[in-house]
Amino acid sequence: MKTLLRRLYGKQKTAAPADLDSYDRKVSTLRQQLPDATEQDCELIAAVQHLTMTSPERILALVNAVSYLATNQIEGDFVECGVWKGGSMVATANTLIAHGDTDRRLWLYDTFEGMSEPTEEDVDFMGQSADRLLGEQDRLQSDSIWCFSPLEQVRAVMQDTGYPESKVNFVQGKVEDTLPQTKPESIALLRLDTDWYESTRCELEHLFPRMVDGAVLIVDDYLSLIHI
């Protein structure tokens, strides 16, 4: 596991020693930051941090949710809406592999072209519109708030996890367009991270009814905007 995670942190190619030193330092820091996390948890979180904007605490919560579902054999697919570079699903896939649970289908919904435009509903608690905030960012910069990351890059990091490729579904496009046509029959884990009101509402309308008993729902942007 540690060799795989060090390779992930090294961006799948031969990593420079400085990169691996940085990875080891991150693991050490996470041990102190997350006292309830296992050594394996810290290694995994350190390995995916360059692939996600999600905090270590939230990644750990996701890993714990996946472990709960695998340990209790709660059947159903795992779904993420709003993938960006794939960090959360990489953490999910690695956790499933660690539990010997590789028969589940993983669904990754994203435009893979950056975030869709916000609407007038997307206002923070300070009264600032998301449209104004995004207007200050370069849409094509991968680390900007627009969250641009091409499908090919996300597919590559998912392949590097070793999770069966036949079980990984990439659904490209706005969820408002794709979900009415393409969605799983049953869901054990539903993680929503598309930020905006309209997309989140669409996801809940189409996917929440398909969640099985004992399933886990994670809304990453809950209370980040007035209407979410």
Language-model features and meaning:
Residues 1-41, 45-46:
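Membrane-proximal basic amphipathic "stem/tether" segments
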Residues 28-74:
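Class I SAM-dependent methyltransferase Rossmann-like catalytic core
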Residues 56-150:
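SAM cofactor-binding core of SAM-dependent methyltransferases
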Residues 65-68, 95-98, 156-160, 178, ...:
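A generic secondary-structure signal
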Residues 102-104, 163-169:
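A short helix-to-beta-strand connector/capping loop
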Residues 147-159:
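Short alpha-helix
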Residues 166-224:
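Active-site segment flanking the S-adenosylmethionine/decSAM binding pocket
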Residues 226-228:
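Conserved small/polar residues in nucleotide/adenosyl-binding loops
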